[in-house]
Amino acid sequence: MKQFNLAEWALKHKSIIYYFMAVLLTFGIFSYNHMGRMEDPDFTMRTMVVGVAWPGASPQEMSDQVTDKLEEKLRDLPGVDYTKSFTDGSKSVIYINLKENLPSDKIRPAWEEARNMINDEWKSLPQGVQGPTINDRFDDVYGIIYAISGDEYSYEEKRQQAEDLKRQLLSVPNVKKISLIGVQQQTLNVTINKDKLASYKISTQQLLTAIKQQSMMVPAGMITTDTNNVYLRVNGLFDNPQAVQDMPIRINNQTLRLGDMADVTMTYQDPSDPQFYYEGKPAIGIAISMDAGGNNVEFGEAIDKKLAELKKTIPAGLELDQVSNQPHIVKESIGDFSQSLFEAIAIVLLVSFASLGLRTGVVVALTIPVVVSTTFILMYENGIYLHKVSLGALILALGLLVDDAIIVVEMMSVKLEEGWGHFRSATFAYQSTAFPMLSGTLITCAGFLPLALAQGMVAEFTKSLSIVVFMALILSWFASVLVSPVLGYKIIENKAPKPESEWTKRDRIMHNLSVTFYDKFERLLHWALGHHKVVLLITLGAFVLSLLSLPLIKQEFFPSSTRNEIIVSMQFPQSSSIEYTANQAKIIDEHLQGNEHISTFTSYIGQGSPRFVLTLEPELQRNNFLQYVIVTKSLEDRDKLYNELTPYLNEEFPSALVNTQFLQIGPPSKYPVMLRVSGPDQKVVKEIANKVKDKMQGDKDLHNIAFDWPDTEPVANIHIDPNKARLLGIDSYAVSLHLQSLLSGTKSGEYYEGNQTIPVTFRLGDNEQHNLSALSSLPIQTGNGSYVPLSQIATITMTQEDGIIWHRNMMPTISIHANVKAGVLGNAKTKEVYKSLQDIRDSLPTGYTIELDGAAEKSVTAVQNLVTPMPIMLFVIMTILMFQLKRIALMFMALLTAPLGLIGVVLALNITRTPLGFMAILGIIALSGMIIRNSIILLDQIEIHKAEGQKPLEAIINSATLRFRPIMLTAIAAILGMIPLMGSVFWSPLAIAFSGGLLVATVLTLIVLPVMYATWYKIK
């Protein structure tokens, strides 16, 4: 039965091919214009955050009675990788991290199960534990942030304006969530006059209870009539500050007005909530998150349009400034990559024209937009957005997708020159090349299989690379057997070669150069075949040398971003108040204002910035924490400011832990160098961590070396004498309540204003809340209403305790982190430090560990996830080779050419000083498919020549000479197509590794593979 010929079918139905070309181009343009646009691809955060509080508890009590119980329960969650907990004072935060190989569709059910487990365990926790607050939407990105500021307006007035804008902006399509930053909680302070309280013989607890009862919402019941249910509503809840002041208090058979013994004032919570400043001015931030699947650029334009309308309603004196504009960044990024895509197309076309001639080159050129357009359609239908990875993948694929078209049109040209007709030439090209091309295309695709099958956050971040390459390469094969023959039939001339008598001077020069080159190449082949042992030993030696050189190449997981932001994170001593942190921020504000390198800057006091880019890791709220997001005018300004700012902050704030860094590409890590120490005993863990820190102190490349478990903080322990307290009619509860009311205030009720719930805070008169020396003389109310100094019923001792306790998998864990000098790569330095700790690690007690943390740990995990599916890749490649070559010996020869790429990879990375990271490793793995593809072409041709009756040695030399041009041409097209990617910080490691490896491997394949063939079959 005659084999079905796709090219023959296409030539008989040219109108259908032209029609679908037009349709695909049209829908491709539509898809490109309507695809979602993002800066970075999405990846699923496999982390849930659980917050709990137990007011009054010490960190150790909180850890023992609350954190450990919840953490132990959550360790039983199916799919959990590890838990990590942070106990700060009487608050605790637990991070639940799922395994990276857990499928994305299993994550949401896992979080539901975690919620159920927390609810089950909650019953066993001590009374008074508050919470839990659960955040399983840890990856929300607030790409657009605005700041509302105005010196003439109060925080509350700014908040009201921000709330109004928020309500209006929620109507914009694709708005997912809007959060306000820096909102200061209003509180209605009820400040009690202690003397009047004593004269009425009313206790603090009695008054507090009376206020609470008055502000409680209590159901009044329902009357059921024959026709209706009528609900009863009893008025009396606080609806304005005056109502609180006029509230009647009935205690000890007397009715009093609260205002007679207290001052009622509206103020802000003290200590304050986390604060937000825009260029040194107090502000309210409006952070806007976009729905998944939205077009970031269009979303930004819609927000801008809405705000342009709303700005007219903003009162004079209030300023609305943009802090973060991710849509603008995305637009620039997509524009840059689109330009790189067109540059790559132009480069590939030039290669085609230069090597194939004008008409033949035009056929290849017209095939490219068909493939690219169809790829856009499939991307659009499969929900793959335009971002740095998907567009970079298209650029990468460009150099590969023209290979099949080049092979087809070149074969057509050869047959036309031999006098064949267009139809016969095109159909013969399909018969002779279609299935070897398909095998080669599938093998090239198989090189990207490890990434497609890999699990984990990093693989998810880069997965669209493999999918887009698969699409483009498979489509390129169909285009080469359907579109290229039709276009070649129309465009390529049926012209026999000119007789030598008609040659021009240029023709003679080109002919002579070609003859000379191929003559020298044949001589080289003859020499190599005659010295096969020497050639194989040299090749093996070069490969071994490359393997040994790999550890010498600097390593970097992912490079820093090229965005203009600098992130400055500062952690002051653990016991620092938020007021102290705010005062330090004012000093920094003055230093930054007017700086020539800065466009804008914002500060977050007591909190970190919202996640305005996916690769930014949010910070916990802490009174001693300060973060700046500084946007510079250019990359050059960013680097200059970084070099100026880091030493200034370290010198000006010696007690603070300063971390100045750029935004990252890829999954985030807080510090470039991170190690962790874990073990069962907290004291021993600290001792080991101090040894590690001391060792790191001697490394000149490191600075700002510190723990995430800070030094102890002062605590005043008040020991109540129960006998003395009992004689005075009080107990420890009454003393604690009195001190809380005196120093910090006690929540005694709520006051409702619109959608605001304002706490009513009960305070006892003027106090010495900021004066530790006055603690012993603080007045404590007795049972009869009189006052005695605290020292009369208690002894006060000052001690030190851990302000923070970190656990990982319920074990005390300390993370030691450091910054690095300019030019030093964090990953490489982390592994270097880890190796230098060998003596400490060898002497660790049983149960204690020192492990990689941060980016270094993530890189090891990511590479393991990438390498794990490689056996599947190998199986697929071997299977395709067996079907194509049909002999085990030939299959192994083709496989053995793949490692040759490593020689070129090591050379290229060393020459360009490019670090070896995740993308470079990905390039090395993907490179193997391309090298094996070239081997198939050569081995297949040798077998064809032998089948035609050529002697084995003659077949080897003729095949290498004949296939030299197409193999080199496709390799050069792939290499030159990578040039636009070499300018990208993210893509350059892959592009350089791939190009260097392919260049060297292609040259070696044309020499070493014939030698391997001759050696195996003993051909002389």
Predicted regions and their residues:
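Signature of alpha-helical transmembrane segments and their immediate interfacial
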Residues: 1-37, 433, 505-558, 603, ...
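Extracytoplasmic/periplasmic membrane-proximal domains and adjacent transmembrane bundles
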Residues: 9, 18, 51, 122, ...
